[in-house]
A protein has these predicted regions:
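Short amphipathic alpha-helices in soluble, non-transmembrane regions
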Residues: 85-93
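Small/polar-rich, solvent-exposed N-terminal microdomains that initiate assembly or binding
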Residues: 1-59, 99-108
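Short, charged interaction patches at domain edges and termini
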Residues: 1-12, 51-64, 104-146
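Active-site-adjacent structural patch at catalytic or cofactor/ligand-binding sites
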Residues: 63-75
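Generic structural motif
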Residues: 33, 49-51, 72-76, 140-144
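Extracellular and organelle-lumenal recognition/adhesion modules and their flexible linkers in secreted
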Residues: 96
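Short, conserved charged micro-motifs
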Residues: 76-86
Length: 146
């Protein structure tokens, strides 16, 4: 049975994204107070869903969990999307996920057939409006017995 620490999954995703997609990476929710960099450069929020245990009786711990990366792109004048930041974040997220689907080894990896995306407009608790790009995928947890 998978007895996996959720924070380890957050750490796995954080380490993939920090400095590659953005320096502003948060777990679980939009922070209540945003930094100047958050409001000018944007930020991303990582969410980890429910872990589904798919272990078998052969001593292998195996599971899956749906995860979401939400990129918050600040608006420019008159509420328009900042195409440069949006494209940079979208491309960086897509590249990170693509690399992980090709790796397909280690304790965690991203399953290729489970990738979804969407976009929306959201407001932060500080009443800042953002365009959001959301990427959803399955992280596979593969722990071999020792």
């Amino acid at each position: 049975m998978v007895n996996e620490s959720r924070i380890d999954i957050y750490d796995y995703l954080y380490n993939l994204l920090f400095g590659v997609v953005s320096e502003n990476v948060y777990d679980m929710r939009v922070p209540q107070e945003l930094t100047e960099s958050d409001t000018t450069d944007g930020f991303i929020v990582i969410n980890v869903g429910s872990i589904v245990d798919e272990s078998e009786f052969v001593g292998e711990a195996f599971g899956r969990v749906r995860c979401f990366i939400e990129a918050f792109v600040p608006q420019i004048s008159r509420g328009r999307v900042n195409h440069d930041i949006y494209a940079a974040m979208e491309n960086s997220i897509n590249n990170v996920i693509k690399e992980q689907t090709e790796t397909n080894e280690g304790t965690y990896y991203i399953e290729q057939d489970s990738i979804l995306s969407m976009d929306d407009v959201e407001e932060s608790s500080s009443d800042n409006s953002y365009f959001t790009f959301v990427k959803s995928f399955i992280v596979v947890i593969d722990k071999q017995s020792e």
